[in-house]
Every structure is written in structure tokens, then in C-alpha cells.
Amino acid sequence: MRPLVCVFTMFLLALLSSNTESVAVMSVDMGSEWMKIAIVKPGVPMEIVLNKESRRKTPVAIALKENERLFGDSALGMAVKNPKVTFRYFQDLLGKRADNPHVKAFEARFPEYQLVKDEHRETVLFKLSEELTYSPEELLGMMLNYSRSLAEEFAEQPVKDVVITVPAFFNQAERRAVLQAAQLSDLKVLQLINDNTAVALNYGVFRRKDINATAQNIMFYEMGSRSTICTIVTYQSVKTKDSGMQPQLQIRGVGFDRTLGGIEMDLRLRDHLAKLFNEQKKSKKDVRENQRAMSKLLKEANRVKTILSANNDHMAQIEGLMDDIDFKAKVTRQELEDLCADLFNRVSAPVQHALSSAEMKMEEIDQVILVGGATRVPKVQELLLKVVGKEELGKNINADEAAAMGAVYQAAALSKAFKVKPFIVRDAAIFPIQVEFTREVEEEDHSKSLKHNKRILFQRLAPYPQRKVITFNRYTDNFAFSINYGDLSYLGPDDLKVFGSLNLTTVKLNGVGESFQKRSDYESKGIKAHFNMDESGLLTLDRVEAVFETVVDEKPEQESTLTKLGNTISSLFGGGSSVPETKENATDSVQEEDEVPTEPTKEEEQESADAADKQKDKEKGTTATNEEEEGKKEEEKSEPQEE
């Protein structure tokens, strides 16, 4: 298995194509509150796209007014006048069922929206009228399409290829929802890249000369508008087969909090301002019942919070908050910190979880780097400095643009139009995935019972892209197996509720018995299920096949060196065709190429342990192996359908 190779030339990108009309590529860092766009085009190695207001970031907001769509700052202006038709923070609803706690929390915080259940998908829809509804994927698709229009205007040429950032804790359903949104906007997604990985790549590329054979462990602490994620990354030069010594980053540990971010502070300050207005008794009405007024207060709360990061106090003021009544009140930094005390108590948890998952101690971390706009809050920095025990926190990358720039490096690497230097990226899957199945076994008293089996497909923090094969040794007739998330006990009870169903899909195999009957003279080598986790962290079931072997006698003069020749026949269920096993579709375990540091990683040690237990697994009825990554990955042949 080869690690994902990300390549980039710091000062020069060589254009391979003579056609410069449509070779630009883009990245979109789609946060909950802000969107950042970057491009690479001939003559412009990397650049952040300016929006129509010449700003480097654009509010993630859409206003749907009759036959007109407004985006960004224009949409925010509409939010004050008509909050019901201005949509924000809808990414929180991607890939989630209507009964998810995140959906309930969204409804409570933003009562101006009417959410209804999509009876077909069991997800949610925004209802504008009896005839008009929009899904979160459709809204995200509109925003992505707008991002492309900004990129094309800035690049002065068509742009179709894109790398999109997603939170590292996005599960399979959430990632597929982002892909669906991109398809609606007619964008070609080169890759979904985890935003923490994009940040780490951006940091490493600009420090390429500082990376050597000695491992450097860097902790990135990112607090954005909606969530917080802490990532431990190891940078090191490694020897590759084709390119000699090259820099590599490896994701070693990850900790996160889905609901710890700047918007939580804004909402608490908004409610505090509403309380102050009611206490002034300038109106007999409760301002909290007025959606337009609450929208104004949320906007003002965000502004005041930002100013309080540099000042001890500030005056909140809104003209015509409600019924032409002006509002003015003094807010201190201490008041804000008191309002958010329980939030600040959660600052340290992602650090501890990242260290635990990496099996590292804080003393092994060389530097802590701040990322994300909410890390500018003084209290966050104070608490973080205390928990990491460092003299200072690193602020030497652009906290707002690092993810967008890292993603656009990857876009240039994946594009056929640009030639760039190698930078190896070994990303890690946060959530383990396993295969579960039930088979009939015979007890000592000759009675029969059903035995439930589990086989880990991808460990927690397993590197990807990666292929795996599960071999079912004891089935001769039709059967089914489930693909589920593995042990998630490291998540809290609230996180598990938000996570949703642990079942990804159930695969039912037909034609197994018929295949065995047709090849009764052959020796079965099991039924092999081929899985692929691609560069976007998406799991697919490529194919399932029955493998048979026949023994052919050789000529006497050859018996001294070869007495038997194995002839493998693979029967693909559904098609029933026989496919010889070749290097391209090999299902046996293949040793990985030596592209990693001399000291084995956690994942490699686990793989060695798995190999040692291979015989034990066969007794259970399955074995799992890796497949060799041969150049470009095969095109996905089939995808499991969700129940």
C-alpha cells in the first residue's frame, strides 16, 4: 500500500498543457461561517480568491428572494430584513437524519427556519412554502457554484476541478453529502481533504527545507466557528522507491469537539444582549420573540466578541432593534468569559484525546500551532497555554487561510496540468470500520447454533488510501454481511447520538451456491470481498468473488522444482464470469513498499499483529489482507447502497 503522494513546487509550477484556457484548479475551504477559495493557474502558483467586495473570505450565507439568489455579504444584509429566507450554518445538517440531536439543537437555536422531514431519505428539508423546499445538500451546492463563479472571475478562465475541505470527523454519510452537493454544482471533485490535513500540508510545504530524517512532532489546535479539532502531525524525510528522499507528514493523533466554536460564544452573547434589552424595559414585548431582532443581535454579538479579543470592554449598539427602539449596552470581556465558562472548560479535552490516540506525551510535541478564527479569543489561548505547558503558542501560519492553501496545493498535485515536487501525505481515518456476519456452527453435542463474528477492516487512525480484502472461508451458499463502524467507545454519549447509525450497509450475496455447484471439481480458496478507502476517506466495496483452484500434474522432468501448478478461477457474483487473478486484481497480501521511517508506526505494528493472527482468523471463517496500491487506483466498480 502506497501512501497518498501530494506534490507541490513552492516557487514554480510547470504547466504541462499548451492549452491555458481551462487548466486552472481551485480549492474551497467551506467552514460553517466563512468560505475561503484558492486557485492555481498558469503564472499564479497559489492565490486566495477575492470576492466581489475584494475580501479574502466570504460569509457562508444564501438568501432566496423570489427569483433572486443572494450570497455572502448581500445575503447577510437580507438576514436582518427577512431571516426566514436567509440560510446559514446548514452544513451542520448534512447527512443527518431528522431525529438527530444536531437537528433538534439547530431548530432551537434558529427558530426562524421551518424544518420538515424528507420522508424518502429520512433527512431534513428547509421549507419555504407549501411547494418549495431545499435540502442542505442543495444549499451547499448553491454555495459551491457561487464559489466557482468567484474563482472563474478571478482566474479569468473556466474552473471545474476542485479540492474541498471537510472536517476530519465527518463520517461516511456526511462526506457523501458533500460530494452530492458538488455534483449538483457540476464541479469535478478531485478529492475531499480533511481540513486539519490541509493545514498540516500548508505548514509543511513552506518548511520543506527544515524537514529531515529526524522526526518533528507538531500539534495543530484549530477552533473555528462551529467545532474544534486538535491534530498531532509528524514531519520527516523518508526514502521513496522512485524519488529518493522526500518530505512526509503523517497524522498521528486526532481529538475533536463538534460543538465547541465561535458560534457558541456568539449565541450566548446574543442571548445576553437580549436579556439586557428586556431589562431596559423600553418595550412591553419580549425581544426574544422577534426573529428579526434576534438576527440583528446575533450579528452584533459576533462583532462585539471580535472586538473584545483586543479590548477589555466595548459598547454594543443597534439602531432600531425593535419597534424603532435603539439598543445600547456596555459589555466587558469578563462578562463574555463568564457567559462561556462551560465552553472554556472544554478547551483542553481535544488536546488530551489527540495525545491519547497518538499514544504520545506532551513532552514529545515540539510546537503547538494555532489555527482558526476562534483561537484569537484571549481566554482560549490562556487555557491552551496552560494545558500544553509550552512557553508560547505558534502563530506563524495564517489561521484563516491555511486550510484553503493546503487544499489548493493538493489540487495542483492531482491536476494533470501541473508538475510539482513530491510531498507525501499519510492521512488517517478517525473512525474504525469492521465487517460483521453470522454463520452456523456445530457444537460438541452435534447441535447447531449461530455464531456472530466481527472482523476489523480499518483500525482507528488507519492510514488511507488503502485497499483491504476480507476472505470468507466457510460459506458455500448465499449469505450476507454488514459493514459497520467499529468500537467508538472513545466518543462521549452525546457524540455517539450525533454520530447516528453505526451500520453503513448490509451486503447480500446471491449466486454463491450456484457458483460452487458449477465448480465442484475445484478446490475453494474462499469468497473474497475487496474494499477500497480512497483519498477522500470514502469506503467502497469494489467487488466480491469466489476463488477456486485446480491442481494440474506437470511433466516428470519438472517435478523436482514444481510439482503442482495452481490455476485460480474467480467467479464474480452477478456476472458469473471467470477472471484469472493477475497483478492488477491480486487479492493476496502484498508487502508494502519501504516509504516510511525505519521506526514502525502504530498502524504497521498492528498490521504485523494481524498477520500473526491470520490462522486464528481463518478458524473464525474470515481473513483480512491489504491489497497493493498499483499506481493510480482502479475506478470504483460498485458502491454499497445504504439501507
UniProtKB/Swiss-Prot annotation:
It is found in: Endoplasmic reticulum lumen. InterPro entries: ATPase_NBD, Heat_shock_70_CS, HSP70_peptide-bd_sf, Hsp_70_fam. GO terms for molecular function: ATP binding; ATP-dependent protein folding chaperone. Keywords: ATP-binding, Chaperone, Endoplasmic reticulum, Nucleotide-binding, Signal. Residues 1-22 form the signal peptide. Coiled coil: none annotated. PROSITE patterns: HSP70_3. Has a pivotal role in cytoprotective cellular mechanisms triggered by oxygen deprivation. May play a role as a molecular chaperone and participate in protein folding. This is Hypoxia up-regulated protein 1. It comes from Xenopus tropicalis (Western clawed frog).
